[in-house]
Amino acid sequence: MGGPLTAAGGRGDGGAKAVEPLRPPPPPDPKTMARWYQLEALERAVRGNTLAFLETGSGKTLIAVMLLRAYAHRVRRPDSRRFAVFLVPTVVLVGQQARVVEQHTDLVVKQFCGEMGVDFWDAATWRSQLEDGEVLVMTPQILLDNLRHSFFRLQDIALLIFDECHHARGNTPYACIFKEFYHPQLNSSASDPLPRIFGMSASLIYSKDLNPHNYSKQISEIENLMNSKVYTVDSESALSEYIPFASTKIVDFDDSNISSELHANILSCLNRLNKKHIEALDRKLHGSSLENAKQRISKLHHTFVYCLYNLGVWLAAKAAEVQSYEENSLSFWGETLDKNVEGFIRNYSEEVHRELSCFLKNGHIGEKFPADSQDGILTPKVHCLIRTLLQYRHMQDLRCIVFVERVITSIVLEHLLSSIHQMSGWNVKHMAGSRPGLLSQSRKNHTEIVESFRKGKVHIIIATQILEEGLDVPSCNLVIRFDPSATVCSFIQSRGRARMENSDYLLLVGRGDVEAQTNAEKFLASGQIMREESLRLGSISCQPLENTLCEDTYYRVESTRAIVTLNSSVPLIHFFCSKLPSDEYFNPLPRFDIDKASGTCTLHLPKSSPVQTVNVEGEGSILKETVCLKACQELHAIGALTDSLLPELDVPCDEEPDIVVENKIEQPSYFPEEFVDNWRSFSRLGIYYCYKISLEGCPKTASPTDILLALKCDLGSDFTSSSFKLPGGQDNASVTMKYVGIIHLNQEQVIIARRFQTTILSFLIGDDHLEVSNGIKYFHEMQVPIGVVYLLLPLVSGRIDWCSMKFSSSPIYEANNKHMTHCHSCKDIDLLQTKDGPFCRCILKNSIVCTPHNNIFYVISGFLDLDANSCLPQHDGTVVTYKDYFKTRHGLTLTFENQPLLAGSKHVKVRNFLHNCYSKKEKEPGDRYSVELPPELCRIIMSPVSANNLHIFSYVPSIMFRIQCMLLSVKLKVQLGPTVQQFDVPVLKILEALTTKKCQEEFSQESLETLGDSFLKYVTTRHLFSEYRLQHEGILTKMKKNLISNAALCQLACSSNLVGYIHAEEFNPRDWIIPCLDYDERDNKKISFLAPNGMYSQRKMSIKSKRIADSVEALIGAYLSTAGEKAAFLLMKSLGMNIEFHTEIPVERKISMKAEEFINVRSLEGMLGYKFNDSLLLLEALTHGSYQTSGPTSCYQRLEFLGDAILDHLFTEYYYSKYPDCTPELLTDLRSASVNNNCYAHAAVKSGLNKHILHSSSELHRKMSYYLEEFGQSFTGPSYGWEAGIGLPKVLGDVIESIAGAIYLDSKCDKEVVWRSMKRLLEPLATPETIEPDPVKGLQEFCDRRSFKITYEKNHVDGVSSVIARVKAGETTYSATKSGPCKLVAKKLASKAVLKDLIAGHKDTEAAAV
């Protein structure tokens, strides 16, 4: 491997910044710092495929960088989207080499490694990643996988660099790239270009074969495989003037064993402990956990024996001590222990440590090294290592690496060297691979250790082969091979770490070990031999590899060119199985039955796989690969593998929503066309359709009045006779609306009616007297264009009150002292001075006036026996005249002192009478609102106007808004089409479904949404279960999510033009459009026509996508609750949902077997109260995925998927119909209390279903046994509420759902049959009286009301979770600690305890609210 660059071609700091979007100035040309052999290698690489074979530290990476610069113009050509790929064998090298390329080129560099989740990327994701990438640095498996899945092709790559190319051997990813793709294309007649190949390595030989006569063959093989020729120098001396070489020395030691007696005693002790703990496992564990634990204890036993022989008693004891650490839950060979095994492993290790410690003498290790070695405390090899290191105590700034073979050796040697007081000045660390394991180290840990090593804070690193290649390690002045190198490559690379001047490379060899000494001599000579052989082969051309892919060794998808080979078939099957549904008791894995004698192999896939068994015959050495290749073909044929040969992780493309809906979208809010017209044409119609609107249940007025609504058209049968409530009014106010026929009005009458309604409504709604009065004054000058046009005519005794309308709508300025003809009812003409001049008393009486000095409107009921000089009592008890009061308070001088004061009252503004939160205690107008007004301060707005008209017209905005929404609901019914329109769904029920909670009206969509949501899931689940019979539960769940997600439902609503019908905001009377009134553009009250869908709109609204999705669900619920399942289903179809609702779902059986051979069918049927026609459905419903033995061919997961939706819908429908008046919150709580896995699990145990489940999981067996033993008596009560079944294994609840699915299928989709059977198991059901609130929710609500702070502290020890709940209530802190099998259980228990204490400590609050 070539390292990062320095000015001399050596290593640098690698600290380059990320490439910016805009290219920075190009870095200096590396050629200016290159050595002669680097330039020579570059020239060779430009001309043809080249393998650079040069020593570690010679600057091979610089050659790669210069080659990338030479190819820069090819990866930047806009007409050819090609790129360069830099392959490195380890993840840590990805970032390291990427930084080097970024530092020395201006190319756009991208890094890829497995932890980025690339295994799950599809072709589109990769295309997006490649859009601007010019150099891709990655591990070889990623490139190989991409080529196999055909995400990109070899011809897309202009330059392909292989770091540490000696890994190109056998079936490694490096080799497979050439065998599966490069050579087949090289040998084909295709004209597609192949990438330029450049490899680099410090050793071309990567084998244990030290026979120099075989070097030529191995070099030729790698040249032919990579279709490249080797470049190297003729000897080390050619490089010695640029890089220093270490002095290699052999350090021998007396390789004698510990005394035979001590050896026998310790070995006997280890064997005894191994046997003891294996026998204990047989008594306490079962199934896979037992086998797992036995294997691990056996491996540990061999490890301790190895340490005893090779390291000594002290280090063997230290190995046992390290393995017994509580935080160490993983064995050091990298296999994860299941939770039930951890304790047994620790106990075994602890006892081994105690026993071995008895063989150790008292005293500090290292006080007498020769004696320790002689007594077997340390082996002579370890003693030699210590002695050798101590010889370098004089060295300043020691940088030493000790290479060992095993991870455990590195760990215990760190402990030993750190314990020796003679080495107290040196800091010792160990480094091992980053795979999961004992004291596992992450790449971050490695980087920190190497950085400390570079800074001199760490002096000695005990390392496995991880430091031979990969990490950018500073040059060392001492490298020791504690364990011999396994290969020539290992020897050369470890020696290459010693690159400081006068450095030493020491080999520890046992005295008399002739083989080791011979191997060391061969290792030393190997470098020169490889150079000579490479130069000798230089003139021989590479030979193409023939038949690297035989027809029966691969399977190719023709449409995509994706390929799976014998090499990749086994990993692909394992990857496929890993994506099948699993749980904490079962990991889906393939199982192989191989009979080498007969040359047959049977592959058993998990029961959730659509293909269960595959059989092949063939060559014994590749049977497993062959059967997996055949399985891949079969899985692809049925769609379980995509055309890219990856597990089907997502739904088919045609099921996915086309867009991702943003959180909020802007849509026009619709307006009913029945209320829209052109004023000119409306006023000349002559014939109008009339509806009588009566307000009932309001406080009685002098003479109750009604309103006549006159329209251009008939509103339809839904409005022939209808009624609705006004919850914001008093005394249960309601409105009835009845069609009364057609009337004829002339244009003058229409104008009078228009003036009246616009005047009175402007007054009731408006605030600015100038705006209102000017609007009335210049009314006759305005011409209303297209807008909201209809008439509201007051009725008296069933007749239109034209008299009131005519006079009250006449312009006031015409009734001054010059024109008194209108005062026909006045006996005496008596003028009073007003703000606008003198007016007759009759004009002022029953008028609406405004006082401009404070801009307040008043209703005048008559005259008072008071004038400006009358006394006005003040709040402080003093008395002033009205004249003085207005002068002092408002700065107004009253000049007409003798005029009587007017009896006025403030008019109550219109409000939202649809609001559900109106308080009956709200103040009503009365004496407290009475005022005395001097006429000269008043401006007359309207006269005369009756109190009755004012009263009923104050309700008009709310009434007409409700009618407006009802009209839109009728329009929606029509829009949904004739198939849906045939069902008689009340308009108000549709309106309920379209009204969000935010509107705060008497009804909202929440309950209907809950009902519709359950039906939507039920129907969708049925459809998917029936249509995709080969897909497992995981895929079906993803499909369902995509079909009915908020994004998908929002998309449907937008496509169906449904959004504009939604009532998403609280009604504000100020925003209501007064009919027949012209509005300015800036008022945002203009009506516009939406050409695409033929609707009218007033404005645009911003609405969350979830609210839109909720409305779709609520609409489904409305049709379901009033017209049945067929209506709801047809509604879904009309909205564009591509689903089917078959009356039956046929069950296919591939094999025949008797369920009675596995389960007690008769007993189960008695328990369920149902007799199965196909008892194999019951068998499937009780089969857990871990039951991999022969027999049932499927596990319960698909039935669980079906049954979950059925039960959810049955319970929701039951509670919705059982408690029709319950609040949405209560409906949700009832549903949540009954429809959850804990409740189902409780019912399963209560009924004894747990005894019939087929499984092979010892952990599941242990958990069920624990609960039955500890809490058996608690399984007799109800199966609802948060405490029922809490903590029970989820499998128990799953079985209830799967049995529901089985009965549903067996009964030909009869929900009633399922309900009777499930109700039998789950009774008694929750009721509003028995439901218990969730304690976590209850505690949160309690604290929110009082602004208390809640904190939770969670812990998990030995499989038991504990939670501490704390509440800070003022100066007092309440806390409770509870334990449980999981954090959720412990949290609920702790919350319950704290809540109980809080309620007791705050008795002044109503406990009911909790």
UniProtKB/Swiss-Prot annotation:
A motif (DECH box) lies at residues 163-166. Keywords: ATP-binding, Endonuclease, Helicase, Hydrolase, Magnesium, Manganese, Metal-binding, Nuclease, Nucleotide-binding, Nucleus, Repeat, RNA-binding, RNA-mediated gene silencing. Mg(2+) binds at residues 1200, 1294, 1297. Residues 41-222 form the Helicase ATP-binding domain. SUPFAM superfamilies: dsRNA-binding domain-like (SSF54768), P-loop containing nucleoside triphosphate hydrolases (SSF52540), PAZ domain (SSF101690), RNase III domain-like (SSF69065). InterPro entries: DEAD/DEAH_box_helicase_dom, Dicer_dimer_sf, Dicer_dimerisation_dom, dsRBD_dom, Helicase_ATP-bd, Helicase_C-like, P-loop_NTPase, PAZ_dom. Residues 569-655 form the Dicer dsRNA-binding fold domain. Residues 1-15 have a biased composition (Gly residues). GO terms for cellular component: cytoplasm; nucleus. It is an enzyme of class 3 (hydrolase). The record marks 1290 as: Important for activity. Residues 388-561 form the Helicase C-terminal domain. Residues 827-942 form the PAZ domain. Residues 969-1124, 1161-1308 form the RNase III domain. ATP binds at residues 54-61. Its main location: nucleus. It is found in: Nucleus. Its cofactor is Mg(2+); Mn(2+). Its EC number is 3.1.26.-. Residues 1334-1400 form the DRBM domain. GO terms for biological process: siRNA processing. Residues 1-30 are annotated as: Disordered. Belongs to the helicase family. Dicer subfamily. This is Endoribonuclease Dicer homolog 2a. It comes from Oryza sativa subsp. japonica. The gene is DCL2A.
